[in-house]
Amino acid sequence: MSNNYEMMYILRPDLSEEQVQEVSSKYKTMLQDSGASDLQVQVRGKRHLAYPIQNFNDGIYIQVNYKADGSQIKAVERDMRLGEMVIRYLTMKLDAEPIALEADAPPSEPAAPGA
């Protein structure tokens, strides 16, 4: 049975744009190779953290939505934990279909005059 998942991970802020793309594509490939489908990856950019993580005050946020049976999560999270690029990660099982990411969302209709 295929479930919807959302994974958010935070990369070190000192990574270059090429390194961010490399890490992002690495985890996307890992998920695809293990049977995940409908992958949507969005780099949210560098943001200030609410509290320091591993002595970093900023981090690069990446969000991944996908469908999978759940067996992929353990391998991906193990790689994130052992690697040095990811400073924090979280995977959540979604009850409903994920909301379209901003880049994939259709343009909103303008409000009707006088409404």
UniProtKB/Swiss-Prot annotation:
It comes from the Bacteria. It comes from Picosynechococcus sp. (strain ATCC 27264 / PCC 7002 / PR-6) (Agmenellum quadruplicatum). One of its GO terms (biological process) is translation. This is Small ribosomal subunit protein bS6. Coiled coil: none annotated. Belongs to the bacterial ribosomal protein bS6 family. Binds together with bS18 to 16S ribosomal RNA. One of its GO terms (molecular function) is structural constituent of ribosome. Keywords: Ribonucleoprotein, Ribosomal protein, RNA-binding, rRNA-binding. The keyword Oxidoreductase does not apply. Gene3D superfamilies: 3.30.70.60. GO terms for cellular component: cytoplasm; ribonucleoprotein complex; ribosome. CDD domains: bS6_chloro_cyano (cd15487). PANTHER family: MITOCHONDRIAL 28S RIBOSOMAL PROTEIN S6, SMALL RIBOSOMAL SUBUNIT PROTEIN BS6M. Pfam families: Ribosomal_S6.
